[in-house]
Amino acid sequence: MMDSRLLDAAASGDATMMKHLALHDPAVLLGTTPQGNTCLHISAVHGHDGFCMDVMALNRSLLSAVNNDRETPLVAAVTSGRTSTTLASSFLRCYRDLHLSEAILMQDKQGNNALHHAIRSGHRELALELIAAEPALSKAVNKYDESPMFIAVMRNYKDVFEKLLEIPDSTHGGMKGYNALHAAVRNGNSGETCQVLYLFASCFFRETKICVRGDVLLFFWF
């Protein structure tokens, strides 16, 4: 269990108290809440950049810790509504510097990884950072069979899905058997978006029959 003083320090961003506790007992930093959260998870959720950097310097293993929902501190930072993407970007750099690719690629209980969450949360720049740092994030699908590309197209994030299209083995599937091309049409995305996806259809979307008549794309789903 987590020391209550450490819990309070993580929630409030009191790095001085955290360091005091760790000085007397370094193992105190490994304590968790009943939900499996470490002090790094908690400080990430609350957006305490300084606390996070200080505690990571004392115990780097916290970066790879997952809670009961299999969320890493990186995912906690991405999904928290209280924080900017600055902290998540800082986490990402730390993961890369320490060669923690496995932790970056971690999928939570719902099958979502940090890229799924970044796109769904509207963090487009962070999504592009994640893709550049770890292209393999593009291969994962969640429990609803949604790929990062599918979610990006549903959100009409052209810059994100175009970057994903540059990755040869990036997955494109979505829920109920749909794919990113289906999503573009169903979502009423711009003709430009559909045209871009069409260029890759022969490689990625073989289950979708496509015909071109003039400037109109016709899609036959089965």
Could you tell me what each predicted segment is?
Residues K19, M53, V75, S89, ...:
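Register-specific detector for alpha-helical tandem repeat solenoids, activating on a conserved position
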